[in-house]
């Protein structure tokens, strides 16, 4: 079974590339971050983005969505587990704070 350490190492290996595009925070939350994963757990990734930078670097909002979906698929393919990506950019400060309490950022 996939471990928290394996996921965090992979996210760390992708950090520079993602940050160049416009991701400003990258982390793991949910059951894997809490060490409570089981055979049915998905991988929950939290990001924060500079939307203007991402559109500038990728060319259009559609290509930003495509890029993030491709990243989600690459994580899922690597670990053979479903992956959810949560972008906190437009969340309220309170919601971000609650999510951040359980997140492990790389």
Placement of each model-derived feature along the sequence:
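Conserved histidines in hydrophobic membrane contexts and catalytic metal-binding motifs
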Residues: 28
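Short hydrophobic/aromatic beta-strand micro-patches
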Residues: 46-48
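Catalytic core of pol beta-like nucleotidyltransferases
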Residues: 1-25, 33-39, 52-106
């Amino acid at each position: 079974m996939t471990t928290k350490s394996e996921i965090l190492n992979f996210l760390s290996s992708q950090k520079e590339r993602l940050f160049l595009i416009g991701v400003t925070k990258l982390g793991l939350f949910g059951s894997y971050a809490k060490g409570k994963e089981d055979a049915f757990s998905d991988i929950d990734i939290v990001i924060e983005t500079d939307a203007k930078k991402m559109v500038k670097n990728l060319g259009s909002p559609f290509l930003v969505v495509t890029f993030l979906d491709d990243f989600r698929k690459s994580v899922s393919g690597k670990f053979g587990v479903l992956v959810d990506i949560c972008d906190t950019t437009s969340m309220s400060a309170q919601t971000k704070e609650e999510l951040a309490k359980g997140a492990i950022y790389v």
